[in-house]
């Protein structure tokens, strides 16, 4: 529905302080015949933190991300688990820069003290490998090819994040060079 779309864009514009010129309803994206993947990037400056057993209710993810943003900590890959049926909680995992580790843990420790049963868990040493290409939206199966290439090297994927022109896999640090 066009009216619903316009309302959503107005709300986004207000939240992110966008001008009318910066907002487009149903933008057209044309195949520019760019390569499916133009480059691969390996980021070794990442860690993974999970906040376990957080309340499964509106605002929980916002509270976690806002708490970290107040400490100038940026998150990249964010994954939320399905609800755990017994206690109505979820787990939220994310990656951030290694040098933000102690600030993030300190900020989150105070926050999760308010949520009974919640705890912080630091994942194993990880790296972020990303395939980037403006041809991805026009090529079917790009993510599958990336996942297959990693599987062929016996590399397990811990987390996945995608955008229109990027597919990112979080993998064990020991496989970073091999994944390239």
Write out the residue ranges for each language-model feature:
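A conserved regulatory-domain signal marking ACT and ACT-like small-molecule sensing domains
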Residues: 1-180
């Amino acid at each position: 529905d066009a009216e619903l779309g316009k309302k959503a864009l107005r709300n986004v514009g207000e939240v992110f302080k966008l001008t009318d010129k910066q907002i487009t309803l149903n933008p057209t994206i044309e195949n520019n015949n760019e390569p499916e993947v133009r480059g691969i990037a390996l980021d070794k400056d990442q860690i993974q933190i999970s906040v376990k057993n957080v309340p499964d209710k509106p605002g929980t993810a916002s509270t976690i991300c806002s708490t970290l943003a107040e400490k100038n900590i940026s998150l990249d890959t964010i994954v939320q688990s399905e609800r755990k049926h017994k206690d109505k909680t979820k787990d939220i995992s994310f990656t951030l820069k290694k040098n933000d580790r102690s600030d993030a843990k300190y900020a989150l420790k105070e926050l999760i003290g308010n949520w009974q049963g919640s705890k912080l868990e630091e994942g194993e040493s990880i790296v972020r490998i990303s395939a980037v290409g403006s041809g991805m939206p026009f090529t079917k199966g790009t993510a599958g090819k990336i996942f297959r290439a990693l599987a062929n090297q016996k590399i397990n994927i811990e987390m996945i994040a995608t955008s229109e022109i990027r597919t990112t896999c979080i993998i064990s640090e020991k496989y970073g060079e091999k994944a390239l």
